[in-house]
């Protein structure tokens, strides 16, 4: 997969800088072996685009909070709109000015860290249940 991606980038964009500036989500989704999560990761982390990566951890967290989504896009748009609407407050909490793509990176990393601490397989750990209860109180 990686070899095919690199070859496609070189053949289409000639170099990484041109790719980072001009690659589209649709173009990447047409690369064999790349799905939404991988494509959004490339666009956010490599290309510094304003797109949030969501994954199975994000889905589990949303489900534990009482939300259900039909597909990846609904899940991404839900979390992405929440981060975007709170951009100013999040920057204050972090005590620095952050671009939206950076906030998406931080938010995704926090979800991953939370999930690794809170889930034992598909089930919440006792500590995870405690944290989810606190989060639900703030909703």
Where are the model-predicted features located?
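Catalytic cores of DNA base-excision repair glycosylases
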Residues: 1-139
